[in-house]
Each structure stands twice: as C-alpha cells, then as structure tokens.
C-alpha cells in the first residue's frame, strides 16, 4: 500500500491510472501499444509492478508518456539491469502532478517509503563500506557493513565511505567517547561482561539502562555522521553546565570527557579550507570506458568530515543525468538537517532549478547549487575531481586485469564465448560426517556473494565412516541443473540463454545460467559432474572443467590428461580464486553444521528432550553455553518446557 507523506494536493493524487494485466507487457506488443497510448503527456510519477504486485521501480518525468514508452521502444539499448526489470513489468501505475517540482517531491517520498529494488541506482557493489545504526532494535547497534540491501526501513545507513581506515578509526574513537552496545548478543545470560565494568557499555544485556535513555545516546552519536559535530558540542556543553549547576560533578566529568574526545575526533579530520562558517557538499564525476566515478566531499565548518564514493555504469546516459540522479538519491536518504547550505558542482544539472527548490524544501532553508569558475571553491571542486579520477583509474585497472584473466581462460579452455559467470563447486565433510557442498559465483571475475548457495547432501549412502565425493558432486550438479533440463524437455532453447540481454525468458532461468562451471577436484570429480549433466541431457550445452589441488591441473571432458598451462597464467589464477573461494565457503558451512549437530547431540543426552524441544532451546538461547549457565526460571520460560524439564536440564549441566 503506497501512502507517501507528500505535499501534492488531493486533486493531483486523484488523477490516477491503473493498468493491470495478467502477464508481462513486453510479451504482448498490441496490449503494450494500447496501454502506452493511454498514459497522459503531463508531468508526474510512474510505478512499475510485477505479477505479484511488488514495486519494481518508481520514476518521474515532465512528459510521462514519452518517458515510460522509452523503456519499451528502446528495449534493446537498455542496460542488463533495466532490461531485466522491463521483462518483469505487468502493471504500470501513473500519478499525475501539476508541476515537475511536485513530481520530484512525490518521487522522493515514494522511494523513501517503498524502497523499490530497481531504484537503487547506486547499487550495493560492496566496493565501499557503510556505517549502519539499527534503529529497528530496542538497543540499536552501530557497525560497519558493506551490505545495504534488505535493510529494515527504520535502520539508517551512512556512506558509502571511500576511506575505510578513517571510518574504522572514527568508530573506534566514538566507542571510547560514548558508552555503547558492543556485541550483537550478550556473553552471559545473567550478568554483565567486562565492557560494562570498564564503562564501555551501559549494561544493555541486563537492561541496566532503559531503551529510551540508550537511544538518546545513540542520537548524539548519529549527529557525528550527520556532520553536526558543532551542534553536538554545544548540546554537550549545555548538559555539562546543567550537571555542574545541579552539583552532579561525576556526570559533569563524564560529559567533559566526551567533549574532549569529540574535539580530538574533529581535529583528526585533516583537510580544511577557508570559509569555515559555511557547510557544503562538493560533487564530482569523471567517466571513461562507460564507467563513472562519483565522489562527494562533505565539508562542515571547514573540515572534511566525510568522503563518499560511488561507481556507476553510464548505460547511454550523459554525466549530467548521472550526477543529478546520484544527487537525488543521496539526499533522499538523509534528514533535512544534514543538507548543507551550499552544494558545489562542476556543471549545471538538467533540472538545476527544480533540484535547488526541492533541496530547499527538504532543508526548510535556502540551498544553493553553485558552479564555481574561479577562487577557492573552484579549487575545491578540482580536488574532488582529481580524487574521482584516481579512483576511476584504480577501478579500470582492476577491470582490465579481470578482463585479461577472462580472455586468457577463454583461450585455455577453447570456449566459444567468454565466461562472464563462473560457478565453482566443492564438497566438505569429515569421514562422511555432515556432508555439504558449496556453489560460489564469480561475475566478470568478481565474487557475487548474493548468488552463493549451500547444499546439504541428501544421499542416504553417505554417512559417518562412508564418504563419497563423486556421489556428492553428482547430486549437487543434478539438483542445480534440473530446472534447465525441464525447460529443454518442454521445448525451450538452451542457446537463447547465452544472450541474456535480448532474451524474454523468466529471470531465474536466464540470470542463473553459468557460462562455465568449475569442480574442485580431479578427473573423477569432473566425470561425476559430467554424468549428472549427461542424464539431464545438458552435457553439450554446459561448459565444465575441474581444477585439482595437487599440481593445479585443469581437466576438461574428452581428455584423459590435464591441460598444459603455465602456473602463472592469468586464466589459471582466476580459476584458483574460484576454487579457493568454493573451498572456504563449503568448509565454513560444514563447520557450522557440525557445531549445530554437536550442540543437539549433547542436549539429546538429557532425558525427556526430543528434537522439537532441543530446537526450541537453541532458538531461545542461541548457544549451548547460554543454556549451560541459565537458571531454572530462565529455562522454564522456553516454549513448551515446564519446570520439571527445566530442572532436568539445570541438574544435567550443574551435576546435581
């Protein structure tokens, strides 16, 4: 349900058009033409939805019909990301506004409220880290993360920051200045840990501090990442003086130490420029080879308090459009108090005046977009552009290395097409115990962790004391490729999967298809995988190889001996990275599974505890150690566990 907080009039919102269909628009040209002709040529917002009524994308335009039509008329020229989106559209919703400014304001509120998947222009490529504060939790945590997707709507992300070292240092100092929650879970169930004793934590685990008071402290911390150090210092000084007037000298001393730490933090921000009374953000964009590097320098009171970086594929857009979209998306995710009075740019934006009006509305004060031509402001923009250029060069060098590795691997394996998506598989167990498998994915030579998968081996012939790597590999490959075998049996053309941009297939069939799969092992493991593909009638369509650990030998179907390769060849090094990552991921999963089994095994020795109660216990306490130190009363609170069973568990661990 879309319920944005917006100043658009009711009259405007009543002008709403809803085009609902039962299948994808891109597959029905006549219906698509009819629907597009019904879209008005006025300004407003458009909302793309899929067959399950999920919001895919929210956009705005001065001329709605032209903008929406461009997605379908120029489909072949769209980026892979947008073409994937267009293939899923089954419904278009239109909201007409009276002006372009109202459309921008409405779009901002709709995106902030609904967070559609394809609206993340500044996609989470994990190049730069974010600072997260989990406001959705009773006692919010603060931590550094490289993952922004699937976040709770109440949580707040700052960044992404280019200088991860400075970010870690800042967070380290903050945790020394302010008593904050240090751990995601408590160490002990019934007492505080050392962090409370030394004043690093206010006793969150035992709720010694109330949630309301703790959130007040976290609110002060958030001001630092909003660039409001001066405001925070003034607030703390007033608080310190109040404590002094009330003769609460111990509390006043704590605030004094916080002020000293805050000043130390401010002084550590090395770069400074004149005009210290002005707060400003400086945007710069540099592009080459269809990739743009965008840098944002956040200057507050003359100090550089934040350096934010993004990379973006150009996708037939010019730099002015990209920079405007980056600016919009950046300020959609901040509070009004975080927007500075000046924003320096290298050129005018396509909707320069509209953006300026929108930002002023968000800030509730005048915001100026300035394109300096000379003096210190111009030099500051040049400094940002220089940093953006250096970052772009670093990115392009990395891309070039990956491209040469992929090209070399193509030649080594004599592939028809370059392996853009490589999947690596490995098995992990101890003498048949807890057998698992991993599937890792590298796209363009870079790990794509959101596409990793774990497999629990189901073969009943694999058990403690009886391992079978070949049978395990066979099972995993068979399970992985079974859906494509069904697609082929139903008359589907597997070759159409190669052109992922132009295909109109369902996205799970399309985007998952690997250009190459690599098995960790030798000829035996390769043959096991090949056996599964042969039974699925996919052995001719799937490119496959294996990489043996002993001599880093590559095996391919049809050859009894390994390929003749140089140990330092870039293609081989890429395969080794895939193999090592598959091994790491499988081993990690195996250890977790083994640990969970051992916990269950220990609990199963307690009379009266079956699998269901053991599961409830572990879900309630998170670990066997927490169960071990729990009191009878705490144990009895577990769902379905009475005092009698609680006594049995307590006596078991305390040897009574």
From Swiss-Prot:
InterPro entries referenced in this protein's UniProt entry, alphabetically: DisA/LigA_HHH, GIY-YIG_endonuc, GIY-YIG_endonuc_sf, GIY-YIG_UvrC_Cho, Hlx-hairpin-Hlx_DNA-bd_motif, RuvA_2-like, UVR_dom, UVR_dom_sf
Keyword Repeat attributed: no
GO BP annotations, alphabetical order: nucleotide-excision repair; SOS response
Alphabetical keyword list: Cytoplasm, DNA damage, DNA excision, DNA repair, Excision nuclease, SOS response
Chief location: cytoplasm
GO CC term (a single one): excinuclease repair complex
Family that this chain belongs to: Belongs to the UvrC family.
Subunit (UniProt): Interacts with UvrB in an incision complex.
Official protein name in the record: UvrABC system protein C
Gene (UniProt): uvrC
